[in-house]
Structures are given as structure tokens and as C-alpha cells.
Amino acid sequence: MAAAAEPGARAWLGGGSPRPGSPACSPVLGSGGRARPGPGPGPGPERAGVRAPGPAAAPGHSFRKVTLTKPTFCHLCSDFIWGLAGFLCDVCNFMSHEKCLKHVRIPCTSVAPSLVRVPVAHCFGPRGLHKRKFCAVCRKVLEAPALHCEVCELHLHPDCVPFACSDCRQCHQDGHQDHDTHHHHWREGNLPSGARCEVCRKTCGSSDVLAGVRCEWCGVQAHSLCSAALAPECGFGRLRSLVLPPACVRLLPGGFSKTQSFRIVEAAEPGEGGDGADGSAAVGPGRETQATPESGKQTLKIFDGDDAVRRSQFRLVTVSRLAGAEEVLEAALRAHHIPEDPGHLELCRLPPSSQACDAWAGGKAGSAVISEEGRSPGSGEATPEAWVIRALPRAQEVLKIYPGWLKVGVAYVSVRVTPKSTARSVVLEVLPLLGRQAESPESFQLVEVAMGCRHVQRTMLMDEQPLLDRLQDIRQMSVRQVSQTRFYVAESRDVAPHVSLFVGGLPPGLSPEEYSSLLHEAGATKATVVSVSHIYSSQGAVVLDVACFAEAERLYMLLKDMAVRGRLLTALVLPDLLHAKLPPDSCPLLVFVNPKSGGLKGRDLLCSFRKLLNPHQVFDLTNGGPLPGLHLFSQVPCFRVLVCGGDGTVGWVLGALEETRYRLACPEPSVAILPLGTGNDLGRVLRWGAGYSGEDPFSVLLSVDEADAVLMDRWTILLDAHEAGSAENDTADAEPPKIVQMSNYCGIGIDAELSLDFHQAREEEPGKFTSRLHNKGVYVRVGLQKISHSRSLHKQIRLQVERQEVELPSIEGLIFINIPSWGSGADLWGSDSDTRFEKPRMDDGLLEVVGVTGVVHMGQVQGGLRSGIRIAQGSYFRVTLLKATPVQVDGEPWVQAPGHMIISAAGPKVHMLRKAKQKPRRAGTTRDARADAAPAPESDPR
């Protein structure tokens, strides 16, 4: 038995360069890169040549010399390969100069799972087109719709997903291998072509091949060799004050998927990775479409164990009809990225009847085995079409046991298991090797971890579980699965199950007892393990503390699609924030994104911000609104907010902040805006622009970090329809009083009527309103229809300012403005000096009242030809509506019944963030490396 040293936080095969991900492995594994004889399935544009002896340092690669038939670039140095010869890995398609072979430290995909430091599953979004991106498994360019991880920069072909390893970013602590020191999380390739190495300052990116590495937390970029010269600890780069550190977030695994943990809307995908899940073939490592075999060759279906047969997932392998059994087996192992010794494996014939069945009892077809003496697929005779890879029985085996804690100087220890070895005997054997011999073995247990690309599953093994039988069972299901399975010796700590479940959409205004009773009726909650920890009565939401993982999962699945009293519920899993562990200078950013706002750019921004920050701090407003995020950050002593949406979205978030202010440890968080709507007047005033048009999301975050804090008035509007101004109105049918908050402006009359018509048109056909230009065109068309309309608004309303009656001129619209921007940037108040009024400011505690005479007047104001009719300025207003009249507040319109409207200041001013003025960059200065490397939205034409 042996112990493998762990140099620092990560170890790289042969030393030198990092495994993209979070590696912690042993240099001993470097010998896993064995040369496999025989030609592979062909690299596509290159022709197979003579195999050259590859360097032992190349981790897991199977290099052979090939003759190049088209321009090719080296995957290590990204330079052009001059001449006709290159070296290609038959498994992962890594291409290299001969001179670069001895420097290759990027591991082959066949051994990559064994190098991951902490296994973390990926979270894939829907398939999409990703321009100039490369697959992390086969290293080919992504041309057809492909998959990408929502949390990290992993891009994959759908049929390559089963061969990717679980090396996603670790965004929270889950009770397994928790640690406070954070290391770089390296991801290979897909860097901008102009990216520069942090160490040598030379270009390290490429648009031709998968080359270079980048930390997915701090954004530092480097050559794979140069990255070894960097300190292993990651400081989160320029965004360190905005990022929520993973060590400060705790979420215990309770059966929830990654998409559920990160509140990501799940997309239905056919099968795991789509690798032939519908019975279709998955092509070989080169991903070229399988053509008719050349004369003298044949194509075989190769299955990896019972699970692949049951799912009808196979790989196509083309071999010579004269190929021997060893050569065919080698080609099959390369196609399935299996790093095991071929001497321990065999190919068994799969009967045609078994291929058509949904389930197949493995081992029944073992009578037809490829052997050198017997018939093989290359014998030239009638041979079966499908074969399955099988493991030969073993009398003993060397097993790697990993410690379940990270603060130890070894990555793993190796023990020999025999038919008599059990989980308990292995624990007794490895504890002295890990320096824990003084502790009681009863407090430790063996844990099996299946490291799938989509799921990481942990299973506690029984003390009497025979390990050799367990390994054979795993190989029976899938030979490759053994390389994706680890065994950890972990302390048997009784971690109390705890899940925080946010439930929204409940009837507002109920008592705690009524909410508990309502939830018990809806979900049959168990009082012994479910309790209500927080109640937001005015918003109709509660937070449940669930002390049982199974009960939490049951409640989540039940409540998320349930309707109570005609209202659809929302159920979200929330982590716990360990605010005491936040760095002293940390002021994390809480991000709210409305994906439905103008142009539908919010979907791309959601993905970009999840990758640039911790996904736990990014919230989709269509999935529960702003309240879940505010509850999660309620104990954070200092944080900021970024709202991505239109003016209505900003008002929604500010209103939620107002209602929850007394619950927040940071009662006055500053709010920044990324304008996604049509008008975006508040965004204009605060210098965030007229609308988002594809700017670099990383640059947006930098601007938020550097923004200046300013104050802004908020106003409360009381709408009371009980006291109608007309005697013919029946108060019994009047609307109940309601209160709305206002930040920008409130319009009565013609402008609200135009907004209402636009709003109704968008609700009827929302798919057409995806362009800001189209939206403005609809406004123009609606305005032209109203150009001759006259309703003499001044005769239908009464206005009091500071309790004094104000006579209104002949107008069609009355507008109360709080900011110097209205109707997509128009200056309604005007810039002319007037001794009757003070110069308006957004924090002066005053509203300006302006009138417009009609659609033509509004058009002239927006064109800068005129200004509105100045009527009054004050802090308290009372408007009497004599008839039902269109009203809009911050772009949200409705028809208000006759009655009163009272507008007054709404308590303390809100803290907003105004974008700092751009400082001219001096000649010769370079951009921040992360700004070059930040992921642009997927729909960005860049």
C-alpha cells in the first residue's frame, strides 16, 4: 500500500500545469498514460501514420504520429504546426508538435475524473448555438446545437456529456470536504484570441483550438504551463468585493438537483447527454459522421456494460476486417474513454434479440468472446453487429481510498482488496496511513461517490459490504464508471438535516397559525420536522425549516406546481449564508434579473452573471420575485443590489426593499440598474444608459463596483375609490383602497392611455415584443390613433397641492415627475429658469406637476421642440377623479375608478448607485484581463 502526496491544494500529473477544474491528485497517476497499440478510429482530416513513443509525462494520452492534410494548430502552444507530421491523442484528439510533447500536462479525458479535487456536478442549460466555442471532451468546434454549463464555462457536444467529468465550480459548502481556503478553478480553452498570459504576458488564447487556461473565479488567464507559477490561492480578482465567497454559503445535499439548488428553470433534454438515448448511435471520438466503411473495414456497435445496453447507448468503431482481438478491444476502449488495462477486459457478443430489448441480463452473452484463436469481428466471416465490453473476474485489486477531509498531506492511499476485504476492514487499514490511528475506527465509515457529469451521488457502504464484489458490480453496469467512482473514508458525523424552503404565492395578510394550517392542508406537512421560521404576511410568503431531506424534497415537488385559493405557489430551495465568515471589506452584490424585460436579453444576462459571480446571489424575478433574494441576504451586514429590467422592474424591487427594510441587517442597500426595458428613464438619469445593448457583463459589474451613491425620493400613492366625485357612482361597487409606490412619474390621462394600449397589445402577443425598436414603433402607432382624441381632462379631475386648490389649464394629460426624464429620455419640465419654482432634483422632496395638451404636444416634447406646461411643485397632492380615467405609475398602467388619489413622500429616501463618469484611458494602458475574458451573452454576435 502507498500514500500519494498532495503538493499544496492541487497536484498535476508530472507537475507543472493544472487540470481544468479543482484537482488534487498524485503524480503516481501519471503512469496511467499508456501507449495503446493499433490504429484508432481516425482523426478526420489527418491520416494515421507511425506511432512514435510518447513521453511518460503526458497524463493519460495515447499519442501517435499522423500525417496532416490541412492546416492544424498545436493545442499546447496554439502555434501552427509546420510540416506534415503531428502527434494526435486517439482518445481526446489533443494535437501537439513533437517539441511540445514533453511539456503536455493537460490530462486526457480518460483519466481526467481521477484528477478532480472535489467532485461537483454540472448544471446544463438548453441546447443552443455557441459560436467559436470548442467541446471540452473531443476538442472539436461546436457547430450544431450544443450544451453549456450554467455555472461554469464548460461547453460540450450532447454525445460527449457522458465522458465529461464532474469538475464544476464549488459554489457552496455541503458538509463534505468543506474548507475556507479557495483555490483557482482552472478551465481550459475558449479564451478570447487576444487573451494574454498572466505570467509571461504573451498571447495565450486562440480562436483555432482549445488552448490556454482561465480561472473561473478571478478570471486570470495563462498558458497551461505558466499557470503552475501562479499562487494556488484565488482572491476572486477585480470582483472580490462583489462575489459571495463559497465558504460563506452552506447548502446540505438533500436530493435536490443543481438546477433546483440554483433556482434555474430546468430544460427537458433527451437522455443524459443524448448519447444515443433514443436508440441512435453516438459517433466516435472524432465526431465525424460515420460513413460507409472502406473496403476491408467494418463498423461495430460497442456497448459499455449493462447500463449502455439497457439505454441503447453505443459507440461506433471502425476497424480492419483483419484486425486482431487486442486491436479491436483497444479501439473499443478508446471510443469509450476507458483507461483500464485491456488485459482485464474482453468483448462479448451481444445477441440481436438483446439489442431490441429494453433490459438485458448482462453476462448471458458471454459465450461469444473475442479471442485470438476464435472468430473475431475482424475475421472476415459473418460476425455480430454489436459487442459489449466486459470485465474479467479478479482475485484481488488495488483500490484508492481518499480522505473525506482536505487538511491532510495526501490525496489518497492505495490498499489491496481481496474477496475477504470489507468496508470495515478497509477503514481499519487506511486510518493509520492517514495519521488517524489514535481515533476510534467506529467513528469512520466508507463512502462511495459516483462522480457523474450531471449528478454526484454519495452512498454510505455497510460495514460488511465486500468491496471486490462491489467493484465487479460497478463494472458489470459500466466499465468506465469505475474510473468515475471514488471511495472516501469519512467521519461518521451526525449532520442534522436542514433545508430552508421558500414558499410564495400564498394569500397575504394571514396569521402564523393560518399559514401553518393552510400549508398542512395543501401539503400534509409533518409538524415534527417542518416549522415556519419566517413569515412575510404582506407578500403572502413563508420560509419553512425542514429537518428531513426526504420531507423537504416531497414538499418541494408538491408545492412548486400547486395552486392555493386560485394562486399558483412558488417553492424555492434557499441556502444558508454564513455572514460571520464574510471578509471585512466584502459588500456582495445581490442580482435580480427580469428575463421578460425588453429584448429578452435577461436570459443571457442570467447565465453570464451566474458564471461571473456565485450563482447563489443571482435571482430570476419570474421565479418568486425579489423576496427570496432579500430574505437570503437579510443577515448580511453590507450588500448592494443590481436590478436588470425596465422601470417597472426597478419599482418592483424598490417596493420589496421598502417592505422588508426592517428585517435587513443592511437596512439601506444601494441599488444599481441595468436597463432592459423600453423607456428606462431612471437608468438614463443615473447614467446607466438608454438600454442594454450587449455590453460586456464583466464591465457592467466593474461599473457597479465603482458607482457613486446618491439619494432618491420615493412617493406613496393612495388610491381610494370609495368617495366618488359623482353622485351617480355606487360606493358599494367601488374598488377597495390600495397603495402603490412611485419612483419616476405618475401619469393621468392621455399618456397613461397610450401606455395602457401598448400594455394590452403586448399581453395579447408577447412574442412580438422582443425588440426595443419594435416596442417604440407600437407606441408611435398607438399615438397616431389617438391624435384627434379629446377628453378635456381638466374638466374631469380636481387638483390640490399642499391642500390648496390649483386651477388646471386645458390639458389632456397630467403628469407628476420625480426625475428629469420622461417618455424615454424627454425633459418634460424643461430647462428654462422660472422664479416660481425651485430647480428640480431627484432628492429634493418635491414633485413637479406638468400638463400636456395631447399626442402632438407629447411628440414635440420627446423631439426636444417643446416642454410641458408647468403647473405646480410640492410634496403633498390630492387628485379627485370625477370619471374612470387611465393612470400609470412608472410604466404600469390601469384604469382607475372615480375617487381620490393622494400622493405623499414615502418615508426615507432610497439609496441608488449612479454610474461614475468614464475617465479617459491613457495611451499604452491595457484592459483588465478579466474584461477580455468575461463571457459575453450567448446571443451576442461577438
UniProtKB/Swiss-Prot annotation:
It catalyses: a 1,2-diacyl-sn-glycerol + ATP = a 1,2-diacyl-sn-glycero-3-phosphate + ADP + H(+); a 1-O-alkyl-sn-glycerol + ATP = a 1-O-alkyl-sn-glycero-3-phosphate + ADP + H(+); 1-O-alkyl-2-acyl-sn-glycerol + ATP = 1-O-alkyl-2-acyl-sn-glycero-3-phosphate + ADP + H(+); 1,2-di-(9Z-octadecenoyl)-sn-glycerol + ATP = 1,2-di-(9Z-octadecenoyl)-sn-glycero-3-phosphate + ADP + H(+). Its EC number is 2.7.1.107, 2.7.1.93. A zinc finger (Phorbol-ester/DAG-type) spans 60-108, 121-168, 183-234. Its main location: cytoplasm. SMART domains: C1, DAGKa, DAGKc, RA. Pathway: Lipid metabolism; glycerolipid metabolism. Changing P246L: Loss of diacylglycerol kinase activity. The modification Phosphoserine is found at S22, S26. Activated by phosphatidylserine. Residues 395-494 form the Ras-associating domain. Residues 584-721 form the DAGKc domain. Changing C160G: Abolishes translocation to the plasma membrane. Keywords: ATP-binding, Cell membrane, Cytoplasm, Cytoskeleton, Kinase, Lipid metabolism, Membrane, Metal-binding, Nucleotide-binding, Nucleus, Phosphoprotein, Repeat, Synapse, Transferase, Zinc, Zinc-finger. It is found in: Cytoplasm; Cytoplasm, Cytosol; Cell membrane; Synapse. A motif (LXXLL motif 2) lies at residues 574-578. Residues 911-924 have a biased composition (Basic residues). Phosphorylated by PRKCE and PRKCH in vitro. Pfam families: C1_1, DAGK_acc, DAGK_cat, RA, RBD_DGKtheta. Residues 45-59, 932-942 have a biased composition (Low complexity). Diacylglycerol kinase that converts diacylglycerol/DAG into phosphatidic acid/phosphatidate/PA and regulates the respective levels of these two bioactive lipids. Thereby, acts as a central switch between the signaling pathways activated by these second messengers with different cellular targets and opposite effects in numerous biological processes. Within the adrenocorticotropic hormone signaling pathway, produces phosphatidic acid which in turn activates NR5A1 and subsequent steroidogenic gene transcription. The L-X-X-L-L repeats are both required for binding and phosphatidic acid-mediated activation of the nuclear receptor NR5A1. Belongs to the eukaryotic diacylglycerol kinase family. This is Diacylglycerol kinase theta. It comes from Homo sapiens (Human).
